[in-house]
Amino acid sequence: MSSSGTLSNYYVDSLIGHEGDEVFAARFGPPGPGTQGRPAGVADGPAAATAEFASCSFAPKSSVFSASWSAVAAQPPAAATMSGLYHPYVSPPPLAAAEPGRYVRSWMEPLPGFPGGAGGGGGSGGGGGGGPGPVPSPGGPANGRHYGIKPETGAAPAPAAASTSSSSSTSSSSSSKRTECSAARESQGSGGPEFPCNSFLRDKAAAATGNGPGVGIGTGPGAVGSSEPSACSDHPSPGCSLKEEEKQPPQPPQQQLDPNNPAANWIHARSTRKKRCPYTKYQTLELEKEFLFNMYLTRDRRYEVARILNLTERQVKIWFQNRRMKMKKMSKEKCPKGD
């Protein structure tokens, strides 16, 4: 029993191994000031176990470990040993140090014009909020965006817009082809003239007072009168038509509606019902002939009549319905119930 117990203890001890402490210390924690690798003479090592149980009749399995086990135990500090296997993380160099003719941008970096990445900056290489904001370049869009979004008219320009950066200029120049349409659209929207709806009304009021911007360069009234027709002829606008209407004498109103007379208001009220579709004499005559021939039209005949008279089938059907009701009413009037 004692020999089997020692065999099982040695076999389990050799399978478990004690290199886990060094590996985990190198991976997950920095080495301490006095920490060193395990020396070759540690009592719990497999070499010591072999020396202790040398009188055992069972030979140890030497194929489990390589011949360099003793050399691995006597090592310098674990951090220096594992540096060849696990390379430490080195932060990438900032984008400003890259080649001037090359555009480098990480896929994790937010867009310069994106609201969440404002202030991240391609020049600083940081995540966001640490470096300066995006700086527009002459070739890029005005607000540094790389996608076509209508800019806000009320937003003030950023204070960092006056500074210049090599990284932002390279990024703007490389993406100028993609943002050509959007930049042109934004420049037109921001710098183009705006024409409000009531601009011609203001011009009209200024021309009436004689002190507005619409007055010509001349100071006398003759100069004003001579400059207005030429301006209207060159640039026609609704204001010109209003001025022409003012020059014409006012016409008296055709009829004054009495607000206290509901009959007059009802006569001149605008009808909400659908307008009637009067038929021409030729269409009415042909429909009457067809009605005298047959009071009820088949579908094929109704289609033919509608095609000949340039009407719709619905119009022909409704006309025949009304004509039958009219004939029924006339027959009732000719034959009273008393007879």
UniProtKB/Swiss-Prot annotation:
Gene3D superfamilies: Homeodomain-like (1.10.10.60). The keyword RNA-binding does not apply. Residues 114-198, 211-263 are annotated as: Disordered. Its main location: nucleus. It is found in: Nucleus. Keywords: Developmental protein, DNA-binding, Homeobox, Nucleus, Transcription, Transcription regulation. Transmembrane segments: none annotated. InterPro entries: Abd-B_homeobox_TF, HD, HD_metazoa, Homeobox_CS, Homeodomain-like_sf, Hox9_activation_N. GO terms for biological process: adult locomotory behavior; anterior/posterior pattern specification; DNA-templated transcription; embryonic forelimb morphogenesis; embryonic skeletal system development; embryonic skeletal system morphogenesis; forelimb morphogenesis; hindlimb morphogenesis. The keyword Transferase does not apply. One of its GO terms (cellular component) is nucleolus. Residues 155-176 have a biased composition (Low complexity). Residues 114-132, 211-223 have a biased composition (Gly residues). One of its GO terms (molecular function) is DNA binding. Residues 272-331 bind DNA. Sequence-specific transcription factor which is part of a developmental regulatory system that provides cells with specific positional identities on the anterior-posterior axis. Belongs to the Abd-B homeobox family. This is Homeobox protein Hox-D9. It comes from Mus musculus (Mouse).
